[in-house]
């Protein structure tokens, strides 16, 4: 319930622009969000593993 409330609060425009912060579009996680994709590292890893992010593949060297 608290997470849903925070997501609803995040969707509103803040009184000052500096109060705005990024959240994952899928799970609502506020930390470690990749701005380019708008999702957190955990969701990014799952989607990349399934091949749902075009042009993304696992690095190995």
UniProtKB/Swiss-Prot annotation:
GO molecular function terms attached to this record: rRNA binding; structural constituent of ribosome; zinc ion binding
UniProt entry tagged with the keyword Ribonucleoprotein: yes
Superkingdom field: Bacteria
Note describing how the cofactor binds: Binds 1 zinc ion per subunit.
Residues annotated as signal peptide: none
Cofactor(s) needed by this chain: Zn(2+)
Cellular compartments per GO CC: cytoplasm; small ribosomal subunit
Keyword terms, alphabetized: Metal-binding, Ribonucleoprotein, Ribosomal protein, RNA-binding, rRNA-binding, Zinc
InterPro entries associated with the record: Ribosomal_uS14, Ribosomal_uS14_bact, Ribosomal_uS14_sf
Binding site for Zn(2+): 24, 27, 40, 43
GO biological process, one term: translation
Family of this protein: Belongs to the universal ribosomal protein uS14 family. Zinc-binding uS14 subfamily.
Assembly information from the UniProt record: Part of the 30S ribosomal subunit. Contacts proteins S3 and S10.
Job description of the protein: Binds 16S rRNA, required for the assembly of 30S particles and may also be responsible for determining the conformation of the 16S rRNA at the A site.
UniProt cross-references to HAMAP family, sorted A to Z: Ribosomal_uS14_2_B (MF_01364_B)
Record's protein name: Small ribosomal subunit protein uS14
Record organism: Clostridium novyi (strain NT)
